Regions:
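Membrane-interface transmembrane-helix boundary segments in multi-pass integral membrane proteins
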Residues: 1-4, 142-145, 161-199
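Hydrophobic cores of alpha-helical transmembrane segments in multi-pass inner/ER membrane proteins
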Residues: 2-11, 63-74, 116-129, 187-205
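Membrane-interfacial loop-to-transmembrane alpha-helix junctions, especially the N-terminal start
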Residues: 21-32, 79-85
Length: 232
């Protein structure tokens, strides 16, 4: 999909070539846009009567990505930026390319879905490549273990509600990477292994293209965040 690439590239180019106070307002605006799409989907489900505890609780990984992306944009906490980056460039990108979406254009769910999915990818690109908050050493493993913890939370939600959060009880209806990983439950360990591989690939590509984290605060006694004009 070209639009996420164009928007991500534009935000990165602007942040690197013309840093300034506009970056703060861009972060706030993008956070509000992601929230509008994310929350708007739940509001729409309530209005049309499709909301249910089996399918509508915020237990999918994309829910975590949305929340983390918003928090990362507003606070620029390094751990949040790293999670937003790794999750957006793996899970969210895959969900954008192969959406498990029952509604097509011009449904409101089509717009809300792509608003917060594409928004998360743009946010990750802006923060990591535009603001140069590159992942620290070990970040990929932190993202992996936190992902497993979220999956465990989703599994508890599945047991309580009878739902299928994070597709732990059944594969998506529409084609995705899980479709080629065998039947339940074998696609679950395969999916975990693939997730780790993708995280390592993203981390490796980031470093190969010059994405090296700044010296840590513990090492030099100063904040590890890049000094930008809008950071107080």
């Amino acid at each position: 999909m070209p639009r996420p690439i164009v928007r991500s590239a534009a935000s990165v180019w602007g942040a690197r070539r013309h840093p300034g106070p506009w970056m703060r307002w861009f972060s706030v605006g993008l956070a509000l846009l992601i929230f509008a799409g994310w929350a708007g989907e739940y509001v729409a489900e309530v209005i049309v009567g499709t909301w249910s505890v089996q399918y509508s609780l915020p237990l999918q990984l994309t829910d975590a990505v949305s929340a983390v992306s918003i928090a990362a944009l507003l606070t620029r906490r390094q751990l949040l930026v790293e999670l937003a980056y790794f999750w957006s460039y793996t899970a969210t990108l895959q969900a954008t390319l192969t959406p498990d979406l029952g509604q097509n254009f011009p449904s409101v769910f089509y717009f809300t879905y792509f608003t917060y999915h594409v928004g998360a990818i743009v946010a990750a690109s802006f923060l990591v490549f535009g603001c140069r908050q590159y992942p620290r050493p070990g970040a990929v493993w932190r993202a992996f273990w936190i992902s497993l913890a979220w999956a465990a939370l989703a599994g508890i939600g599945d047991l309580i509600t009878g739902g299928n959060y994070m597709y732990l009880r059944a594969r998506p209806v529409h084609n995705s990477l899980l479709s080629v990983m065998g039947p339940w439950p074998w696609y679950i360990p395969s999916g975990i292994a693939l997730a780790l591989v993708l995280l390592l690939v993203v981390d490796g590509l980031t470093r190969a293209f010059g994405g090296v984290a700044a010296v840590t605060a513990e090492a030099d006694g100063r904040s590890a965040r890049p000094r930008l004009p809008w950071v107080m």
